[in-house]
């Protein structure tokens, strides 16, 4: 919003143009507020684009130099655990030039950045480019989208459809209706973003079925990096996230007063925003007798050694026990029915003890925990199928007491 457009106290700007934010609560949008420093300054800030998890903001800042020339650069900032935005920095020296870079658009894949520039080699005027995030977090050299998308005229404001197939942009090229016109085109395969899948659901109280605003995160199991960290809607408990396809993820959900929820799953086939994968999440209140299956705890086959992929889940258990210091729990180990009962009982006991030992090593008092192996005595699924046996091979923690 710009100064001449919004001059009331609620939307007063710090400079010629500022960024503002409003959040959706239930089916309505809340108050509009200025994003303040360090995002907004006395300069010109505009053209925002959020990452799919809402935690990284890309925008354009224009600063007028001593020669009177206004130069536009693309900046980025991240929101921390304290809900404060970091000091904005240049998105990349490979992207920003001595010319103008603007009209930034980060695709929901969080890996493909489209922008407009007159500082990179092009067809003339403003051209549209793309850059891709590299495994180390840096950006590739920008690639010009080429003719006939770019011409000797100005092209800008590219938006790419969620499935990455269609692009929409503005241009003042010859043959239009005058000034800027809107155009649509099909992106070549080489210029498309990474295939993504949309997932939605609702977080709710397992007893009352009332919606809950809960924090959730999705972790790429291969890299162990958090790819989404957000909160379900305050009014409806609903969430919608976008994730790269062809990967395995751990889902963790937590809210004060409730047991946390965890699950692992794999996304193979891209699903559109209009037909997303649905995962509703019931949260159980903290009380004696309630248990949680630790779905992201992994052991070597037929062994009781914890695999490195288990650390993300175990850190959630540690955080839960640290926050809820009056809770006492039992760590239970369970197996399928393959093998002798004696062998399964022994293996499950050692696996439960391995988790117990890890938690003690992380500073959780041993007096608050116990461990026990149950072998195949408490199946939660039919052992006749591999899928059922996989569900029965599990680690649980159960609340046995809540001290007053």
Predicted regions and their residues:
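Periplasmic OmpA-like peptidoglycan-binding domain that tethers envelope proteins to the cell wall
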Residues: 117, 122, 324, 332-404
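Short, acidic Ser/Thr/Gly-rich low-complexity loop/linker segments typical of extracellular
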Residues: 222-238
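Structured interaction patches on ligand/partner-binding surfaces of diverse proteins
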Residues: 256-280
